[in-house]
């Protein structure tokens, strides 16, 4: 039996294009390691920032551009791919759009399907699902861009509401961007109005969350119908918050795996992660972010990432390495889970 042909789909049109390329390079290396070299043949498919798909010999940003005629065509090699491994982050990647395309192709693929991916990308929908099953989370206010731009008086009323319900500091986020893109911390009315304008330029939907003094913890989930949770890790940093630069610049943030927290807190986080994974109808993989408030003992779920990063700085593969699963074995498991899910 020949090697399984894995379509490694990376790049994309979002602001997280470069992160996707770095993740794909790490995944390609894992597929070449050990037994995986005999199991799999990686077919790199690069999505340019204008949407063109290109077959490349290796993972990276190729020189030049694809021909104009390729805008609405897939490379011929696409027809030979047995299973897809999409690692396209952000909008048009992990929001259900790529997943819907792969469903139309009738090919198995790594990760969650259309619905779970879309819910996981939209922070407002995500928090609605978490709330529906009773998961504890920080207070938040959901807004539409039209709420801000339709009437100056209404704008002021919205700011009054945010100050009353959430107070300061608070965090303003575009609902559908990942990797902390477009997030602002507001400590007063002036910063709040600026933050709302920034978020509204990037997304039609905006979420404002109450600030909380807490430790930031993460847990990785792997599986389909019977998922498993990893050890819990902690992120610490010296910046105001865990923004894009902090997240992807070496040395800006420190990962502590496993986190030094009470065993009961670790078990609670692992249990909540599995509950959330199953409530979303997720498949394959996801990473869940939490706040732990030592002064009260509270554990609050913050977000899910249904297609987490796989760079050298990324928490997801490191959490599984600390749980006894190497990077090469992790990508092998993910492909097998994809084949199982789509059988």
Curated annotation (Swiss-Prot):
It is found in: Cytoplasm. InterPro entries: ATP-grasp (IPR011761), ATP_grasp_subdomain_1 (IPR013815), D-Ala_lig_Van_CS (IPR000291), D_ala_D_ala (IPR005905), Dala_Dala_lig_C (IPR011095), Dala_Dala_lig_N (IPR011127), PreATP-grasp_dom_sf (IPR016185). Residues 127-336 form the ATP-grasp domain. Its EC number is 6.3.2.4. It holds the Pfam family Dala_Dala_lig_C. ATP binds at residues 163-218. Mg(2+) 1 binds at residues 289, 303. Cell wall formation. NCBIfam families: D_ala_D_alaTIGR (TIGR01205), PRK01966.1-4 (NF002528). This is D-alanine--D-alanine ligase. It comes from Thermosynechococcus vestitus (strain NIES-2133 / IAM M-273 / BP-1). The gene is ddl.
